[in-house]
Amino acid sequence: FEMNHLLTTAHIRQDFITGNYKPDPGNKFPINERGHPRYITSNTMVDKTVNHLLCDEVLTPSISKYLIYDNGASQKGKGVAFHRRRFEARLHQYFTQNGTNEGYILLVDFSGYYANIPHDKCLEVLQTFLEREVEDPETLAITEMLLPLIFKTFEQDVSRFTDKEIEAMMAGKIDPMLNYGVDPALLTGEKMLRKGVDIGSQPSQNIGIVYPYRLDNYAKIVKAVKGYGRYTDDSYAIARTREELLELLDGLEKEAKEYGLIINRKKARIVKLSSEFRHLQVCYSLTETGRIIRKINPKNITRERRKLKAYKRLLDSGRIDYATVENAFKSWLGSHWKYMSHDQVYNMSSLYYELFGRRPKWKKGHGRLHWLMAHPSTASTSMGTTTSAPPPSPRPPSPVSSPCPFFHFG
């Protein structure tokens, strides 16, 4: 693609002028993420180029002002680390304003989120934002032409099902692996399901962060829940009483149903802030002094230990090189060590050394992490936790918006 960049770009432009551009469905392959099978789509370089242009120049600017600040996924300057900082700031804010850790948190997510986004409703939402924000008529016309073509590649072949079964799929939850391993002879293209978006394409990221915006507005504006945030399909809300959160959950479920989304009531839970709860694979609890105790999910440790042993087998068989192993481990440890105890960091480092006979190296920085990896803990026991600094003491009756001046609250 790079060798013929200018020529390929000219061909793409010509296809747009003549109306002959049609995106390719791409290459779909399965992965297993924490025990959950998922279908990932890899687009062609031509389609990636078009998607980047569409999202960077049109979609992202059009939807950004309609997203709440605590919507932390797939946006420039945000991400998992940003969302976790905001989440902890919300916990501190609650303690500062109420002077106690006696409260509750609602943790909720959607069931089969990406696979169950209805195309017609989603296009309607995107169309609303585009008409408001895109001033250039030609840009708007091209975008309105392009989006249905992209959604066409998201459609799933359901030719082997009856009309009644397809109707049930549109009304209920469908399996994202619906066509995985199915005989190609059964996928005739006679019937297509207009539901679900591909994981792996850039337009899907924009869709994922904006489509449930009405639920965010319901929580923030209608119910006035300041301590609310969302990361793709994982949402949280903090309130003083369980009843407030139950009422919020019922309202969110009604809004979600209107948009064809399914809230997972089995996984939705309301727990005390003083007890241990998990959000984005980190366990938290708010103490009576306002400190936040953070702890890595033990399953993450177990999973990474198994991965290291699998990497060792692959390395011995010559299927991967050491640099791949080292980079994978450094990536994992670099994003998790702040939520691990001294013992956990040291034990993971020791296992790595035992398997590979050397320790991972960074070109610069990570001095504190290097020390934890090289020195065993002197404490007799370890809770496997780290704690964030406590917020300032509450000063009623003057409200304090946040103990962390870095953040603002909408």
Per-range role (PLM):
Residues C55-P118:
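Active-site-proximal segment of RNA-dependent polymerases
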Residues R395-P399:
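Compositionally biased, intrinsically disordered low-complexity segments enriched in Pro/Arg/Gln/His
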Residues L130, V134, E253-L261:
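A common structural junction motif
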Residues N98-T232, A237-E247:
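Conserved polymerase palm-domain catalytic core
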Residues K48, H52, L178-N179, P184-R194, ...:
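Right-hand nucleic-acid polymerase module
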Residues G26, G229-D233, K266:
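Short Gly/Ser/Thr- and Asp/Glu-enriched loop/turn motifs at secondary-structure junctions
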Residues F1-I17, K22:
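A structured, charge-rich N-terminal accessory region that forms the first stable segment of a protein
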